[in-house]
Structures are given as structure tokens and as C-alpha cells.
């Protein structure tokens, strides 16, 4: 190097030091209890954050077994996203061990995903005979696309608190996520005509379909302009299904697919042979065509009930990452809708 420098000086060639690069800003470290929250967070943070999830996508979120590696993960986190109800009862012990004030409840990086969501199944009374009842309401909030919008807003709020210098960047990406949800749910054409927030407000109030049926555009009902997931779900709208566990209520409300029977008699209580037989008889009597279950429950039992009733089993992941190729919230909802449509149609549903 010395010889080269001497030669350059002799030739009167200016010697310059290599350019000094500005230090890359530290990326925001986001940890989520569930992979679906992680997928939403990833859409918002872009390349300015690193997102990790504790539970796997095919794991029952009620019964996650904490690993020692989770403690340093939370200890270094800037943001922690959890449902905030009584779904992940394993979270408080992890937070205690991590001892990170930033992400404990009340800290700037703690995000309760349920905030601002109208909870279903809030009990008016409680006793142990009801099983593992959720005392605050049904915590499976992510099964509704409009709830996913509110979850994204909650994550954005936490990100702004811990990384105000990136607030505008995160806000724009969160808005992009909302816009994509509206287009995926209602269809691009209807969103252009009425705007996503307007349609979302009507939907939350339970007035969307009456509005679309009675209001016209260019001489035809606005319902003709409906697209997206809601249009794909029209063939099975109003048709009852049987479910394994009471985790589809928000999905059922959005798409009007009521769960009328449950293999699991009460939350957290394994079904007895007698109860399973009752469900089989009820499904036969009511001509239930579809049995919906997530893929962490007893697959053999689900398939047995489906076989004995003539129903089609739809076995799908509850969260992103729970099956191959299901990486985003949009992948997850696409799968749920397409598998139910297939089950109610002529083809057989695929178990994932």
C-alpha cells in the first residue's frame, strides 16, 4: 500500500480516503406473540424493522410452551405485540423473565392488539363448568379483515412511540396495508366508487349488504359491483357449518357463516365419545355440509366426524406460517375463503 501511495504521489494523482458511509439507523426490533401479528407488523415496518414471532403458525396459541430463547428475544425487543386478553396466558411469565420495561404492559413498546375492537362472546357470568372461558370475550380477533385493520393501527401506534423518527414511513405503509385490505375485502371497483373507510363503516354496523342491495349505480344495484373476499364468499353466505373450537366467530360475523355445532363441547374441554356422537347426529339432522377446523386439533377426529356425517372437512391453519406458502395475512384469508368455497361447491376441500 505504501509503494502504491508513493507512486501515485509521484505521478501527481490525488490520493483520497475511501468514502465514509453514514451509519445505518438501528432497525426497530418487533416481537409478536402470534405469527399473524408478525405478518401484519412486517407489512408496516418494511426494511426499517426486524420482526420475530414466539408461537409458530401451526401451534395452538392457548398452549405455547415457552423456550429459554424467548427471554432474550423479548429482552432486546423495542415493540411487543400480543392479543392483550386471556389467549396467551404464557406471556406474562415471559415478560417477567425478560425484564424489559419497554415492552411490559404500560411500556411504550407494549401493543395490545385487541384495543379498539368490538369483542364478541363477552360472558355475563363465569363458572368453571363453562370450561376455559375467555372472561374478556373471544380473543381470536384476527379472523376478521376489519379487525386486522385495527390491529395494524395499534401496531403503528406502538411503532410511533418507540421510533418517532420513522413515524411517517410507518404511517404510509400502514395506510397501504389498510387500502389493500379494503380492496381485497370489497373489491377494487367498489372501493373506488365509495372508498374503503365508508364501506368498512357500513360493514361494521351490519348495514353493508342492505345498502348495496337498495342503492343503485348506473341503473343497477351496487351489489353488482361487489368484489373481493365478500364476493367470493357469497355462494356460502348464510350457510351453517360445524366447527371444532369457538375461534371463528369474527370470521363468521364478517362472512355470515354461522358455526352451529362444536366438536369441543366447551373451550379447552376435550370432547367425549358421547358428545362427538351428539354432534354427528345433530349434523345429520341439520344437513351440515362443512366441518371447519384449524390444523392443530385432532385431525383424525375431524376426519372421522366428517366421514360419518358426509360433511367435507376444511382443515386450515389459524395463523400465517401454519401451512406452506401462507406467509401474509392476505395468503391466510385467501386460503380460508377458497377452501370454504371449494367445500360448498363441487370440489373437495384441501386439508392444510
Language-model segments: which ranges?
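Bacterial N-terminal signal peptides
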Residues: 3-15
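Extracytoplasmic metal-acquisition and chelation regions
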Residues: 18-352
Amino acid at each position: 500500500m505504501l509503494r502504491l501511495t508513493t507512486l501515485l504521489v509521484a505521478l501527481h494523482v490525488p490520493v483520497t480516503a475511501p468514502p465514509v458511509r453514514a451509519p445505518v439507523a438501528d432497525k426497530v426490533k418487533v416481537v409478536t406473540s402470534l405469527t399473524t401479528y408478525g405478518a401484519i407488523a412486517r407489512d408496516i415496518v418494511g426494511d426499517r424493522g426486524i420482526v420475530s414471532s414466539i408461537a409458530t403458525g401451526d401451534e395452538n396459541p392457548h398452549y405455547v410452551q415457552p423456550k429459554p430463547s424467548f427471554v432474550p428475544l423479548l429482552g432486546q425487543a423495542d415493540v411487543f405485540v400480543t392479543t392483550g386478553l386471556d389467549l396467551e396466558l404464557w406471556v406474562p411469565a415471559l415478560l417477567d423473565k425478560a425484564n424489559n420495561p419497554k415492552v411490559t404492559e404500560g411500556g411504550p413498546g407494549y401493543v395490545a392488539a385487541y384495543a379498539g375492537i368490538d369483542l364478541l362472546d363477552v360472558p355475563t357470568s363465569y363458572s368453571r363448568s363453562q370450561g376455559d372461558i375467555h372472561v374478556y370475550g373471544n380473543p381470536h380477533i384476527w379472523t376478521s379483515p376489519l379487525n386486522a385493520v385495527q390491529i395494524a393501527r395499534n401496531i403503528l401506534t406502538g411503532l410511533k412511540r418507540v421510533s418517532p423518527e420513522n413515524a411517517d414511513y410507518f404511517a404510509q405503509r400502514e395506510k397501504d396495508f389498510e387500502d389493500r385490505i379494503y380492496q381485497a375485502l370489497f373489491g377494487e371497483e367498489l372501493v373506488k366508487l365509495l372508498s374503503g373507510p365508508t364501506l368498512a363503516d357500513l360493514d361494521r354496523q351490519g348495514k353493508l349488504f342492505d345498502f348495496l342491495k337498495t342503492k343503485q349505480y348506473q341503473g343497477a344495484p351496487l351489489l353488482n359491483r361487489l368484489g373481493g373476499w365478500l364476493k367470493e364468499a357469497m355462494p356460502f353466505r348464510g350457510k351453517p357449518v360445524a366447527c371444532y373450537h369457538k375461534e371463528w366467530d369474527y370470521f363468521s360475523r364478517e362472512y355470515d357463516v354461522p358455526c352451529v355445532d362444536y366438536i369441543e363441547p366447551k373451550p379447552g374441554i376435550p370432547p367425549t365419545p358421547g358428545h362427538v356422537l351428539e354432534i354427528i347426529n345433530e349434523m345429520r339432522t341439520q344437513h351440515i355440509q362443512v366441518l371447519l377446523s384449524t390444523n392443530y386439533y385432532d385431525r383424525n377426529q375431524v376426519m372421522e366426524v366428517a366421514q360419518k356425517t358426509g360433511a367435507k372437512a376444511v382443515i386450515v391453519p389459524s395463523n400465517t406460517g401454519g401451512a406452506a406458502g401462507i406467509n401474509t395475512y392476505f395468503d391466510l384469508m385467501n386460503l380460508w375463503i377458497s377452501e370454504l368455497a371449494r367445500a360448498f361447491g363441487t370440489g373437495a376441500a384441501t386439508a392444510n
